[in-house]
Amino acid sequence: MVRSMPLRGGRPQAPTAPTRWQLQNTVFAAESQNQPSASEAVVSSTRDAALQRRRALTTDGKAATLVQGSVGGGRVRSARDQRQPGWVRRDKGATSGVPFNLSRSSLPITNRQHPLTDTAANARLRAYEQEVKGRFDRIVPLLQRVSALQHEPDFIEQAQRLTRAELGFDLPQHILERAWVRPLDMRALFAWCVFESHRLFSDRFFQDDPLDGAAGSVAARDFEQFLLDCGIHLLDVSPCADGRLAHTVAYALRIPFSAVRRRSHAGAMFDVENTVNRWVKTEHRRHREGMPNPSTEPTRYLKVVTYHFSSLDPQHQGCAAHGSNDELAAAAGHQRLLDFREAVENSFCCGASVDLLLIGLDTDTDAIRVHPPSRDSEMVLDQWLCARELHAATASMTADQAMAQIAEAIEAGASGPMEPGMVAFLTRLIANNCSQIDYVQDLHGAPYPDAGHAERFIGVGIGFKEVHLRNLTYFAHLDTVEEGAPDLDVGVKIFKGLNVSRDLPIPVVVRFDYSGRVPGARERAIADCQRVNQAIADRYGELVNQGLLHTCLTVRDRNQTAPAEVVGSTLAPPLQEAH
């Protein structure tokens, strides 16, 4: 196959679309036929001077001098003006002695509400988080009360009444009925309560859309149109599987969950081959159906990696998959993005390529840092914008002024000229993140109290569209335990500290989504659940035999809004043998 290479200075474009270099060259050729008037020369000179001033703001720790003064009434900046803004971070050579994670800001906590904060959305998200997490948090206190009742004559009735009142479901009858002959199996009851709590919030998520982000919702349609306006036809985000990033889409970035493709992996190390296949499906749909837009339109597939770091305890509460090394987490995510782009460009002709973006998330404050990509998707690892510092710098401005300041900072922070659509996209992400920064501050009065892991269960398989809360679920997306062993092992290690150390079991929810449009898909999804369940039992046999690991098997039709269906569990009552 002959590969179509982009010309020098241009980027590969979607298979049937012209490259940006071609588009720009056409415009340049048309403009070059006409000599600029005197007024046009003044405008051009004014713009050049403005760009020089902007460059002065982002020089690596040095005062930049303009070639000449501004023609349009601007002034040449003094040395005081030429200092680098606090939200733009440069290479380590210019900041000797400063650790890599310069987002560990010493900014004081403020109670001032940012002009870009959506207080109504914050109130709605807060109510949902407290409702869901509150049920999980009531499990242990409830079971302690149930344990104290196990020798009462009406134990089963009291236990069920308490559980219904506190958690909204019944305990398994077959476990309660054994309490008179042997000690109550509190480990099994704990796992049951976790599984039932997951079932309840999953049901509500798909039936009521508490996050207002379902497909077809006003928020989802508006954001999808915004993406197209930015030149993006699909947004594909890979956060780390750490439960402290499970809320990245709906909370930290405030993106309607149905408008983004999300799949989490340990260390944000997404599978390149699988992602290429998803890119192929996306482009094929554009060709065949014109969805979300025709393939002839010059829009791009944007792949985002979200790594994380801790501003309070960087040596211990960073990414476990990268040994709490912020620099390694960012570098590994960046390299995986480059591998994905190279795989697409090497495998397909006609200038096929993708756009790339690297984002960091502070798991203590939910403030993001973005590495602004140039027009060629080039990013510099030690060059980023800190949303928390931008939040502080723009807190006293009006909303319009804050948006303009953020946009200017983004352009100034890139390693080269940026696409206007990418500037608009990043401006919106940082503006959205201002709401989340205030959300954490208002809810906790400080950074998160649970700086480390506090997940409630491990989610294994393919699916879990309903999980959008911080520290609720550790994800292990996999088709087989063998290929997903690194992700799953990290999760089990985390839960050995969270649960097993307290003599509580590790709850594992196995999920495989399927397409109800495909004959036999449901049966195959159930078989996948059973296969993975057996592989988990084999790999972690000691924990399973001690009752320290329980599984719940679920499947869901991704083409419907119906909740997941439970198809098996290690807590199911034993089958009676027929004679």
Curated annotation (Swiss-Prot):
Its cofactor is Zn(2+). Zn(2+) binds at residues 240, 308, 319. One of its GO terms (cellular component) is carboxysome. Residues 78-93 have a biased composition (Basic and acidic residues). Binds 1 Zn(2+) per monomer. It catalyses: hydrogencarbonate + H(+) = CO2 + H2O. It is found in: Carboxysome. Its EC number is 4.2.1.1. Induction: Carbonic anhydrase activity of nitrate- and urea-grown cells decreases with rising temperature (from 25 to 28 degrees Celsius, present versus predicted future ocean temperatures); there is probably more than one carbonic anhydrase in this cyanobacteria. Inhibited by dithiothreitol, partially inhibited by acetatzolamide and cyanide. It comes from the Bacteria. Homodimer. Belongs to the beta-class carbonic anhydrase family. CsoSCA subfamily. This is Carboxysome shell carbonic anhydrase. It comes from Parasynechococcus marenigrum (strain WH8102). The gene is csoS3.
